[in-house]
Each structure stands twice: as structure tokens, then as C-alpha cells.
Amino acid sequence: RPGAVVQFHVPRFRKDRVEALERSLLVRLSQNVLTCPTTACFSLLAGDPYYKLGRKLAFFGDGHQFRDVRFDRPVWVVPILGGEFVIDRRFGYRDGLMGGNLWLLGADLDAALSAAEKAARAAAATPGVILPFPGGVAASGSKAGSRYSFAVASTYAEYCPTLREKLGESSRLPEGVGSVMEIIINGRDLATIAAATQAAIRAAVDTPGLLKISAGNYGGRLGKSFIYLKDEGGRVKAEG
């Protein structure tokens, strides 16, 4: 049967990150997995620490839920209109990394998007990573912070092609670039994200109309982990 490995991330800076991750899991699994025909749900992380997530979601059974052993795993079974929903009793969690990124700078939209789609497919094929944006590509790459106090991120004006003339010398967009696409890579550890980054670069580098591959470096505001896009002698920092 087809399956999918899914990762959920919450920012480390949240003081309630453990509780926030559990809430996110409960909402996503109940709305998007429990409701989907023929699905079951299992945890890839065994041992401590863990959430008793299966028990909480099993309350959907309204008293008809029961514990069992299926596929040599301790699970909760929930009777549903489509048959049964099976879910592991415990779901483990651990530290990971968010926010590895690549920028694909193209002569026009088609070139940038074509390169980004190639990069996204290659990165997504790397075990242990996810690309959290639709199709793996973000057209609205952002900077940390905003002139508005209620916003935590905003458009990166210095790299917007349509703002080149308005910003004048403040524009940081290289000559000839007409569009910038970004891919974001989250993963289980730095080495895994680095491997996905290199796979993405190899897949995209020969795209016609691709002028540059770079990455967002936000002055250390997004984290202390760095992935180098090039070997010694020409390093470019990508924050995670």
C-alpha cells in the first residue's frame, strides 16, 4: 500500500513547544488522516519522550474504541463508518532543524520556477527531510521581521524584481534576474538537510535561464546552524 512519512515541526523559541507540537499533531491527524479513507497512522520514533497521542485521538470512538495489537504494534482501534481506524498508542518526538533554504534566481519566472521544481523534487527524495511549502516551492520568500509590529515576517523587498527601480541602490537583486523562487528544507538533523541541499543544487544547476543559486542569510536571526552551498574557497551560508 502507498504510504507517506510526515514530519511536524514547531520553533524551538516557543516556551510551550512540547505542548504546541502535540496540539498540532492532534489537529492535523484528526482532520487530515482520520478522515481519509483506508488510512492508518504509525510513529517512526520509538522510546522516550513520547505523547499518548493514540489514546487522545481514539476518543473519537465515543466509548467504542479499544486497544489491540496490529502489525506487531500496540495500537488503538477506532470504529468508523468506513471500517476501522488504527493508530499507534505512542508517538515519539525529538529535536530537529527548520529553515534550511535555497534561492533559485532566474532570468524570468519560467526559468526560476523550473529550477526550483527540479531542486524541490531532488531535495524531497532525500530520506529524513520535508519541504513544507506547496509543491516544495515558495514564491514569497520572506525576511525576518516587519515594519508592522504584529507581523513576524515580511516580503524581502531588496530582492523583489518589481521593486528594483523603486529601491534603486538599495536593491540587492543581481542584474538580469527577473524572478526568485525559494525552497525551504526541514529535517531531522543538519547532515540530512545538507545532503538534501546538495541534491537540490545538482538537480537545478543546469536549468536554462537559471542565473544564480544562493540562499537567505538573515544575520543569525533564524538560527546558529549553517549549511555551505559550496566547498572551501567559495562558501555561501544558508541558515537553518
Model-identified regions with their sequence ranges:
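Conserved mixed alpha/beta catalytic, RNA-binding, or beta-rich assembly cores of soluble enzyme
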Residues: 8, 12-13, 23-180, 195, ...
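Short acidic, S/G/P-rich loop/turn micro-motifs used as interaction or catalytic elements
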Residues: 14, 190-191
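An N-terminus-focused feature that recognizes amino-terminal "leader" regions
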Residues: 1-6
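Short polybasic linear motifs
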Residues: 235-240
